[in-house]
Amino acid sequence: SLSDKDKTFVKAFWGKLKGKADDVGAEALARMFGAFPATKSYFAHWPDLSAGSGPVKKHGKIIMAGVGDAVDKIDNLVSGLSKLSDLHATKLRIDXXXXXXXXXXXLVTLAANFPADFTPELHVSLDKFFAAVGAALSDKYR
């Protein structure tokens, strides 16, 4: 679970990241498609899955808005992300394991874009945060 220290690290880093969130989201999404090709199946209707394509940029922005929402609700992710969890489980029917693939791509993207900030301590805190977000998003699957 997230300690107070983890929450402090995540909130502080989000403050630095916010201005580049849309670009980071598109890059992380494109990275996920390359590293985890099975995730492309949810977006087969998009002709271009690169970070520069319109649909990837748009969805990257949506994802990062969700991450920002999770940061705001970091003290109660299951309740705070309940509607998003329901959307993923019932309407979009996204495999809950895809969250782990998205988290791995996001961590690599964040490390590449913020090398000076991406300390081992931040890495651990972000990893725990993304795991908690993934668990909250998969809550409606149970």
From Swiss-Prot:
Heme b binds at residue 88. Acetylated on Ser-1. Red blood cells. CDD domains: Hb-alpha-like (cd08927). Residues 1-142 form the Globin domain. GO terms for molecular function: haptoglobin binding; heme binding; metal ion binding; organic acid binding; oxygen binding; oxygen carrier activity; peroxidase activity. O2 binds at residue 59. The keyword Translocase does not apply. Keywords: Acetylation, Heme, Iron, Metal-binding, Oxygen transport, Transport. GO terms for biological process: hydrogen peroxide catabolic process. PANTHER family: HEMOGLOBIN FAMILY MEMBER, HEMOGLOBIN SUBUNIT ZETA. Heterotetramer of two alpha and two beta chains. Belongs to the globin family. Involved in oxygen transport from the gills to various peripheral tissues. This is Hemoglobin cathodic subunit alpha. It comes from Ophisurus serpens.
